[in-house]
Structures are given as C-alpha cells and as structure tokens.
C-alpha cells in the first residue's frame, strides 16, 4: 500500500484489497486520518500489490505495482490515467533491461519526485531475502517518462542525479 498527496493537497490511500485481487484508491479526509468515503476499484481479479504512484507536470498519473507471488520477484506492472480515479490504462512491464522479468529482483515501494528537476523521479524498491530477511536491501533507479505515455525503468549499477539532465 502507499499514500499519495496530489498537488491540490488531497491525499489518497492506494492498496490491494479483496484478497489482493483488486487495487483500490480511496480519498482521505481533509486531515488525512480517515477515508472520506470516495473510492474506486480498479484492475479487478488482476492480483496487484505494492502500488506506487506519481503525477507528471502535464497532470498524468502513473502507477507501478507488482504481481502477487509472495517472496518471489516478478515483472512490474504499470498503468496511466488522466484522472486519479481513472479510467486506468494498463501499460505492461516498465522494466527494459536485464532481469526485467523480476523487476531487478525487487518489488516497488515508492516513487520519489526529485526536487528542482521537472518530471524527474526515482523508483524505490525492496529487495527481499526470505532466507535471511535482515539482509533485505533497497534499490533506487531513475524513472524515465517516454512522451508522457509510458514509464521506463532501466537497470543502472551506478548513477547520480545528473542522469536527469539528458
């Protein structure tokens, strides 16, 4: 699950529900402490979890999530919408390089906007180690937006914020 605060200061709780079969977006109250009662179900029976959300400067929303395979890594899933409540369009796996079918052996956890750089985002993910959970790690990768239509994640052994200047 994740929380997302839109540029109008409205907050949303995005989570997997119905035995992990369906994602929900629920608007929170003005003080962010309870659900407002306004919500939307999407991708019923698709079994997504670990949703993350971002909004581009053009106003388009993107979600990256994971399939429900327990400790086993799987291909990420992405979707876009012009409104937070949809309709949402499935875009497929945003990962484009080696180990893309395992989301680089990780699962989405958050998308961090880079302050001071327009439409620059960092994809943050958990890398689980079921045999020794204390050894779990995190990966951070630059997230590219292609023509405001697709998001793309490419594995980088090393990178810094200058990657967003290209």
Description of each model-found segment:
Residues 1-166:
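Carbohydrate-active catalytic/glycan-binding domains of CAZyme proteins
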